Amino acid sequence: MENFKHLPEPFRIRVIEPVKRTTRAYREEAIIKSGMNPFLLDSEDVFIDLLTDSGTGAVTQSMQAAMMRGDEAYSGSRSYYALAESVKNIFGYQYTIPTHQGRGAEQIYIPVLIKKREQEKGLDRSKMVAFSNYFFDTTQGHSQINGCTVRNVYIKEAFDTGVRYDFKGNFDLEGLERGIEEVGPNNVPYIVATITSNSAGGQPVSLANLKAMYSIAKKYDIPVVMDSARFAENAYFIKQREAEYKDWTIEQITRETYKYADMLAMSAKKDAMVPMGGLLCVKDDSLFDVYTECRTLCVVQEGFPTYGGLEGGAMERLAVGLYDGMNLDWLAYRIAQVQYLVDGLEEIGVVCQQAGGHAAFVDAGKLLPHIPADQFPAQALACELYKVAGIRAVEIGSFLLGRDPKTGKQLPCPAELLRLTIPRATYTQTHMDFIIEAFKHVKENAANIKGLTFTYEPKVLRHFTAKLKEV
């Protein structure tokens, strides 16, 4: 099989979900009713759902079987200890708090780290800034509602869709240290390393870059949180592209990666393959006070610290999913599926970011150059794609990035991208071919696609619930 151009899916499909086909007229009415926002479409009106890979894919038979072991005790569940043991074995982190999903972890750790910096280092809340290679939208949102400005420090290659670079998710290390010096180290409550960098196109971060970033953080005594949603995909790219680690296993690379952070926050709905679940973990006793305070907040916001909003069966499933998501054959297939879609789109003249781990990212700015950034070209493209083929995708651009919370002005976005997110073990190569064909039709009508303007704009995380209309 090593010499075959394309390998089939490395799994057998045992359960299927029927989907309905709709007419163009039906879809046009549905997208207008949604306020030109695919987030607000009903799932039954979607033919191929590429909105997200978060909790939308299939689970393995071992994960499903593990649910039968669930201990639903309110306190001290043995299912919690099974999950905590998986975390120790995989990441080397001693303290585990389960949460209902990634943002559950964020709403706990962010205020705790800000408070710690304020008490121990005299942080000035009016000047505080957190840094990342690129903040995920909810991490940015939770930071901002806690009064913390966020600053993304990424390399110049990150958003240039015309450039191929092995690790486009890397930190701009000089920019990071310069930024810390500018705002004052004591005013930096945390650094977030996002692996892979979702907003840059699912692009990986090298181990060398993570090591250097962590060295800078230790120099200024700033805690590092690893945003770990796609930890296994990042490890796979390291194995493929960082020569020093080509003979390492995914498990070995993962363990090494997590030496270069102090905490991890995870939406387990991605690489751990579960429909619902998250993690907040602390590496060792150096931040035991943070762990203790986070446990206290967990009780109020998520649930008792040994279940954190998850049933026992869900914790058992997650304990297994963390391992299953690191399977090398599975990762090779998943990355190849994304590459196949990107290659097919580029063959028909649709410019994409280089293939990342979980999605194809179409450069909407280049496909729709007549639509200015403040009329959201990638959102307009998402609506057109749905009208043409019933495919739901998501904007990663100015619409998502939002406004400066202090000035109210639209934040400048480095690229206007449309993310075609591939749920795990859900769609076949035939689906990828259909998506490519749909873009042929979209491309033919590109000049007639109109920009969008708000009819309703929430103040925080607007892209989830905003409504728009054509200009």
UniProtKB/Swiss-Prot annotation:
The modification N6-(pyridoxal phosphate)lysine is found at K270. Its EC number is 4.1.99.1. Pfam families: Beta_elim_lyase. The modification N6-acetyllysine is found at K5, K115, K156, K450. It catalyses: L-tryptophan + H2O = indole + pyruvate + NH4(+). It comes from the Bacteria. Keywords: Acetylation, Lyase, Pyridoxal phosphate, Tryptophan catabolism. One of its GO terms (molecular function) is tryptophanase activity. Its cofactor is pyridoxal 5'-phosphate. NCBIfam families: PRK13238.1, tnaA_trp_ase. HAMAP family: Tryptophanase (MF_00544). This is Tryptophanase.
